């Protein structure tokens, strides 16, 4: 497939935004449980604002993918069957909840509304946090299922697509939370950094499993089933046009196999070992810059990872365009 | 229920692209148009087509066969492009089974083109909406036309009569009989999309070639002319 920058930025920015928001709520839950020192409400408010900006940027990127962006509002119509429609519905819900969570913290609407059990006092921010977490997780599933639900793109048609989007998005968000904490100099760097490393490692396991699966993938369609001729040797001589077409542009990445393999190595290094080492090093030398560098290195790696994700998918229609494939 | 479809006889198609050009002509000026071409006279021409003829060579030299393979939207009975459309612009007509795009609803997200394993959909570079074969819906449903003309443009244009059109759910229709009696098949049956369009396979032909036919020999007429020449006047000696 042809990797479109709009979709690369859409999926990575949404992932980082949702991850950062999940990190904020996780931090608050830990503070409620008294595992962590409570932070000023401003901390969560600013964190949610950054998450919201990332979500808005992701939404903005998505418009560049549309031929007719002025009609984008129509895209919520088919939520019963289309994962794209479901994403279009869940995304504004997540944005609204992230916004409300940030506003509630900013204005310190933290008077307990009711009490659960002996100690747990539930306030507005906690309620919004839980709702936002559920919506965020739903958004991860919707975004990933847009790709995982296309059964013809066998490279994508696996639950590992969903787990990759979830874990890599969450990892980059927690990495950003660690960078944010390091930037303002609060003691949560270790907490967020450790979670970021754990999520990065889970993401690595998921992505490696995905790569391994795809390397062994046997494609269902062959040129024989595509044109219905049972003969071992079928060679295309003409594609029906002298120049290119939508089909030759949309379904091919147009790069060499060696570049694809090199980029795979690059993102596997940028997304996984380097951020983990940088976080570990920042604990040792107490540097506040390293977590920030770790986030940017990982995010750059994730952009390449997403490019590869699109490029490595081989659409069955390519069988009709052998000279381009 | 009616399911209109094309049945394409690969045994007859000679790859003349008449169906391609007549499709383009009819549809660019009709309900589905325009189907614009970009850079038509320059190095990299491109444009929107509903129907393309591709050519495949089967076998290894010298035992090869050429298959000209016209391909357009197959109007699947289980069209995977329809449920993925977020706006409902992509739909299947309940009355005749033709899969269509509502150009006023399409947002150009290309998702349906990803969901079609046949690559039958193309985003129009000018109108920025998804386009595909409509089976000439504006012709075949036009009651003002005579029965003979109520057929897709490609079917009427085919000089070899390689394209049949009709209801594949009606067991007595021309297309159903052709599928039944001439081994009609579907493309990529492994996906369960149940394409309504079918293809009729090439038939085996055996040809006897005398080895002498493959080598160039002297003009046989001359050979026969080698008669005993005894000096009398022949036609060649006549001065005109």
Swiss-Prot record, chain A:
Single GO biological process annotation from the record: anaerobic electron transport chain
Keywords: Cell inner membrane, Cell membrane, Membrane, Transmembrane, Transmembrane helix
Protein's membrane topology: Multi-pass membrane protein
A GO molecular-function descriptor: dimethyl sulfoxide reductase activity
Cell compartment(s), UniProt: Cell inner membrane
Principal location class: membrane
Domain of life per record: Bacteria
Keyword field contains Membrane: yes
Pfam families tied to this protein: DmsC
A cellular component term, taken from the record's GO annotations: dimethyl sulfoxide reductase complex
Assembly and interaction partners: Forms a heterotrimeric membrane-bound complex composed of a catalytic heterodimer (SoeAB) and a membrane anchor protein (SoeC).
Similarity section: Belongs to the DmsC family.
Name of the protein this chain belongs to: Sulfite dehydrogenase subunit C
Taxonomic path: Bacteria, Pseudomonadati, Pseudomonadota, Gammaproteobacteria, Chromatiales
Gene: soeC
Curated annotation (Swiss-Prot), chain B:
Listed cofactors: [4Fe-4S] cluster
Native organism: Allochromatium vinosum (strain ATCC 17899 / DSM 180 / NBRC 103801 / NCIMB 10441 / D)
Gene3D superfamilies: 3.30.70.20
Cross-referenced PROSITE patterns: 4FE4S_FER_1, 4FE4S_FER_2
SUPFAM superfamilies: 4Fe-4S ferredoxins (SSF54862)
Membrane topology classification: Peripheral membrane protein
Cofactor binding: number and manner: Binds 3 [4Fe-4S] clusters.
GO cellular component: plasma membrane
Subcellular location field: Cell inner membrane
Name this polypeptide is given: Sulfite dehydrogenase subunit B
GO molecular function, one term: 4 iron, 4 sulfur cluster binding
Highest taxon of source: Bacteria
Pfam families found in the cross-reference section: Fer4_11 (PF13247)
Ligand binding ([4Fe-4S] cluster): 13, 16, 19, 23, 73, 76, 81, 85, 106, 109, 112, 116
Sequence ranges assigned to domain 4Fe-4S ferredoxin-type in this UniProt record: 4-34, 64-95, 97-126
């Amino acid at each position: 497939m042809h990797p479109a920058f709009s979709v690369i930025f859409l999926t990575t920015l949404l992932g980082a935004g949702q991850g950062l928001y999940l990190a904020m709520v996780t931090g608050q839950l830990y503070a409620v449980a008294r595992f962590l020192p409570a932070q000023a409400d401003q901390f969560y408010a600013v964190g949610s604002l950054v998450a919201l900006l990332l979500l808005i940027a992701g939404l903005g990127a998505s418009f560049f993918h549309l031929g007719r962006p002025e009609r984008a509002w129509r895209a919520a119509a088919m939520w019963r069957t289309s994962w794209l429609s479901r994403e279009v519905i869940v995304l504004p819900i997540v944005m609204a909840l992230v916004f409300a969570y940030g506003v509630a913290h900013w204005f310190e609407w933290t008077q307990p509304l009711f009490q659960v059990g002996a100690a747990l006092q539930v306030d507005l921010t906690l309620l919004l946090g839980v709702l936002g977490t559920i919506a965020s997780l739903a958004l991860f599933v919707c975004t990933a299922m847009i790709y995982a639900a296309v059964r013809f793109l066998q490279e994508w048609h696996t639950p590992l697509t969903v787990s990759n989007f979830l874990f890599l998005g969450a990892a980059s968000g927690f990495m950003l939370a660690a960078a944010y904490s390091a930037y303002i100099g609060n003691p949560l760097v270790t907490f967020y950094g450790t979670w970021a490393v754990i999520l990065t490692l889970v993401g690595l396991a998921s992505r490696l499993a995905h790569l391994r699966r795809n390397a062994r993938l046997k494609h269902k369609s062959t040129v024989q089933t595509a044109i219905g001729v049972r003969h071992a040797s079928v060679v295309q001589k003409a594609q029906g046009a002298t120049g290119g077409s939508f089909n030759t542009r949309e379904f091919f990445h147009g790069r060499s196999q060696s570049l694809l393999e090199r980029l795979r190595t690059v993102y596997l290094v940028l997304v996984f070992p380097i951020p983990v080492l940088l976080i570990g090093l920042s604990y040792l030398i107490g540097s506040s810059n390293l977590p920030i560098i770790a986030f940017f290195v990982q995010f750059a790696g994730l952009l390449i990872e997403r490019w590869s994700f699109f490029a490595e998918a081989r659409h069955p229609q390519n069988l009709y365009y052998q000279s381009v494939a | 229920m009616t399911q209109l479809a094309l049945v394409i006889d690969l045994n007859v198609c000679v790859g003349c692209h008449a169906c391609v050009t007549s499709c383009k002509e009819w549809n660019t000026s009709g309900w589905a148009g325009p189907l614009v071409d970009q850079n038509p006279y320059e190095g990299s021409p491109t444009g929107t087509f509903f129907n393309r003829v591709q050519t495949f060579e089967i076998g290894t030299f010298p035992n090869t066969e050429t298959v000209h393979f016209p391909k357009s939207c197959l109007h699947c009975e289980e069209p995977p492009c329809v449920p993925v459309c977020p706006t409902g612009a992509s739909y299947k007509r309940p009355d005749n089974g033709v899969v269509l795009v509502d150009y006023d609803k399409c947002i150009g997200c290309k998702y349906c083109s990803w969901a079609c394993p046949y690559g039958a959909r193309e985003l129009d570079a000018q109108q920025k909406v998804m386009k595909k074969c409509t089976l000439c819906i504006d012709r075949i449903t036009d009651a003002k036309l005579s029965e003979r003309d109520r057929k897709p443009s490609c079917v009427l244009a085919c000089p070899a009569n390689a394209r049949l059109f009709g209801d594949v759910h009606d067991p007595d229709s021309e297309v159903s009989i052709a599928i039944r009696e001439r081994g009609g098949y579907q493309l990529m049956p492994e996906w369960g999309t149940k394409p309504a369009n079918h293809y009729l396979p090439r038939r085996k032909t055996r040809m006897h070639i005398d080895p002498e036919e493959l080598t160039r020999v002297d003009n046989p007429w001359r050979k026969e002319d080698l008669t005993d020449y005894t000096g009398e006047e022949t036609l060649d000696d006549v001065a005109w």
